[in-house]
């Protein structure tokens, strides 16, 4: 019998019409029978402040409890100024504190994203990989930079072209294998 693993789906954007939210939706529509995606909100988290660690806000507890309950994390992010978005870095910081409650440690993490710039999310993903590695996450090797095309995702929320669909499906299959090995 094949297990099904809950996967925290973290979209590193707080825009309502985010390209990455659309990308995330298309990813969840792919064939991944062993993965069950849970959309984890990060836009309601207060800015990280060490003074709040002792009496953590309810939104922070909700976020960390949801991530902790998942077998892996898929982060879908834009790139801001050649790095990761502040809203995502804030969520990562809350998830890592205090150190003995770090939700990222030993957690399988896959990273992808799209941005309108010429190099997409290449530099931002490298920054995120470095941060997640320092926090003890098991970051899946290989890159998944998704070029932003006018028709990346169709009106039904699926990938508009077979090449992108096949590429992302292969990446998702590798992630499912990693999660299965580490869960």
Language-model features and meaning:
Residues 2-33:
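N-terminal beta1-alpha1 ligand-phosphate binding loop
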Residues 2-4, 8, 138-183:
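Glycine-rich phosphate/pyrophosphate-binding loop and the adjoining helix
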Residues 16-19, 48, 83-84, 120-121:
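Secondary-structure boundary/capping motif
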Residues 32-38, 137:
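A generic structural motif
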Residues 38-47, 144-151:
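Short connector loops at secondary-structure junctions
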Residues 42-58, 155:
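N-terminal beta-loop-helix "entrance" segment that forms/cooperates
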Residues 55-135:
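Helix-loop-strand module that forms the ligand-binding subsite of alpha/beta enzymes
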């Amino acid at each position: 019998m094949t297990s099904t693993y809950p996967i925290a789906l973290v979209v590193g954007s707080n825009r309502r019409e985010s390209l990455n939210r659309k990308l995330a939706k298309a990813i969840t529509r792919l064939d991944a029978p062993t993965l069950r995606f849970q959309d984890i909100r990060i836009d309601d988290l207060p800015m990280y402040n060490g003074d709040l660690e002792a009496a953590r806000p309810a939104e922070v507890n909700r976020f960390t409890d949801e991530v902790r309950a998942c077998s892996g994390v898929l982060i879908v992010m834009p790139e801001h100024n050649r790095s990761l978005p502040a809203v995502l870095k804030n969520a990562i910081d809350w998830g890592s504190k205090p150190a003995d409650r770090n939700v990222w440690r030993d957690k399988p993490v896959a990273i992808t994203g799209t941005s309108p710039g010429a190099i997409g999310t290449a530099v931002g993903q490298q920054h995120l990989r470095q941060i997640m590695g320092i926090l003890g996450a098991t970051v899946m090797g290989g890159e998944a930079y998704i070029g932003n095309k006018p028709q990346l995702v169709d009106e039904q929320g699926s990938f508009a072209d077979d090449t992108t669909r096949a590429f992302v499906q292969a990446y998702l299959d590798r992630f499912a294998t990693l999660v299965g090995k580490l869960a």
